[in-house]
Structure formats: structure tokens, C-alpha cells
UniProtKB/Swiss-Prot annotation:
Its EC number is 3.5.4.25. Belongs to the GTP cyclohydrolase II family. Binds 1 zinc ion per subunit. CDD domains: GTP_cyclohydro2. Residues 1-20, 25-46 are annotated as: Disordered. Zn(2+) binds at residues 176, 187, 189. It comes from Meyerozyma guilliermondii (strain ATCC 6260 / CBS 566 / DSM 6381 / JCM 1539 / NBRC 10279 / NRRL Y-324) (Yeast). This is GTP cyclohydrolase-2. Disulfide bonds: none annotated. It comes from the Eukaryota. It catalyses: GTP + 4 H2O = 2,5-diamino-6-hydroxy-4-(5-phosphoribosylamino)-pyrimidine + formate + 2 phosphate + 3 H(+).
Amino acid sequence: MASKDIVHPQPERRHGSETHEFTMPLLSPTLTPSHIPSQTPQIPPEVPAEVRDRLPLPETLPVVKCMARARIPTTQGPEIFLHLYENNVDNKEHLAIVFGEDVRSKTLYQKRPNETQQDRMTRGAYVGRLFPGRTEADYDSESNLRLNFDENGQLIRDPSTTCSGEPILARIHSECYTGETAWSARCDCGEQFDEAGRLMGEAGHGCIVYLRQEGRGIGLGEKLKAYNLQDLGADTVQANLMLRHPADARSFSLATAILLDLGLNEIKLLTNNPDKIAAVEGRNREVKVVERVPMVPLAWRSENGIKSKEIEGYLSAKIERMGHLLEKPLKI
């Protein structure tokens, strides 16, 4: 079966000023566990229909296609497999940072007309590990693993070669140049990214869907203007609204489509954001969040982590204005 072509639209600017309140009977523990919780999971309740109706969830999911995959050794120890995606809703290259060689993209592994085994290895559609002299993508002689395909060239998800067991950890992470690259103490984005990677590396499996939605969807330039407004006294929500943007302009339907492409229909979601649970599950619950794993700031549970008046104001606004599922630590 031929894969769908990706047609890139022209970008469209979104404006709005509406914020919403949504409370769930679910609070984070005082500490984020240092290991994956197994005895007392944070089970997300059913998201009410009116919440799904209120969120801008599309009737149909975007079309995504994984164009390349590569093994990345990391400075932290565990290897990752970086997947690059194209899609039909924007002109950006979004990423899936995957822990575990056996998490496989349907669109990456789909057989393509006139391709060779070398072509498949070059784009990352192989099993096992690459090594000098290897000639087959679909068979790894060192591990004796072989991929099988149906008559349409689609990968058969065999448990011996493809992850298909318990739901794995997932995080939907939006790009944050300031927090991840410029050492910003205005937000905890970089800290959450690192913590998600630590937990996934410890678990052996996981997926960070990395969406190119800088500044909660408003872009880096507008985000820098928002920072100036915050220095003038606005909080993170007020600053966006003053710039005629929504408090949160992101869409997570691309993440839903990417998770489905990777065969991750059930996940344990690392998040404090209740709206993200409904948004990632999608209007028709194509993905199911079976557990919420809280992301408690490091500074709230140790001497480490980000400490600044800016981060305290940022976290307070997330809790008080955006309904994030966190409890501030008691100050004695």
C-alpha cells in the first residue's frame, strides 16, 4: 500500500485570549519518584466529554511520516534512537526521541518502491545494530533477528523484534530554546526534558515526542517579548494575552499521530498538565493514557534544580492560572 504524500501548507497565525479552568481529583505527590512508580500509579480519570469538546481537538489526526532514524550514544549512558518526522499541517521537522531499539515506526519501515537493503539501512529502517560489512537491513546476523512484512510491505509487529508489552513512558515536550540551550531560569523545560530522559533510560523504554512549538506555540520572537512583559510585572499567562496570543497556542495532535506511528497506543504520560492528557489521547481516544507520572521540580525535593524568583512565578502561574497538577511545597 502506497504511503500518503506529505503536502505542506502555508503557516497560519493563531490568535486568541481565552483561558480555561479544568480541575481533576488528582494531585502530584510531594516528590517525583527516583524510579518508575509501580505500586501507586497516578491513574488519570476519564476526561469529561465537555472537556474534549472545549479543547480544539481535530476530527482527524495529521498525516505523519518518519523520514530517518539514527542511533545516538549519549553522555548520560543510555542510547537513544532519534526519529525525524514530516507532516501535512506545518513545515517543521518534529522529532521522536526513542529509548529502546525495538520501538518501530510504521512509516519508516514501510517497504518503498525500488529501494535496496542499503537504502533501508541508510534511512535507519533496520533491526538490531549496524556494523561494518552488514548487507541486510531486515536481518541482523549478530542477533539473529529478522523483520517480517505483509503483502503490502508493512511491518508485521512481531513481539520478538518489536516492543509490544507493557505501556511505556512518554513525554510530549515542546521546543524551548531558552530553557534547553540558553540556561534560562525562567522555566523548568530543560529540567523536565532531562528528568524524562533519566526515567526512560532507567526503564529501558520510553519516547519523548519533541514538537517544534517554541514559546507554547507563539514562536521565539514573541516569547522574548513576553519575557520583557514579565519583567514589567505580568505573569506568563498575562504576557501571552497582552501580545494577543492564547495562554497556550500549542496543538498536540501531531504527538498523537507520532505515538500511533510508533505503535504506542497505551502510554504512561509524564506531565503535570491535565489538558495535555485529553489532547494527547485525541478526540476519539486513539491513544490511551493509562497512568500519569508527575514532574515535580527538582528544587522542590532537593538542593539541586532551578532556583529563581522567575521560576517561582512561572510555576505559580501554571498551578493557579492553568490548572497544572502540582502542590507547592510548604515553607516553614
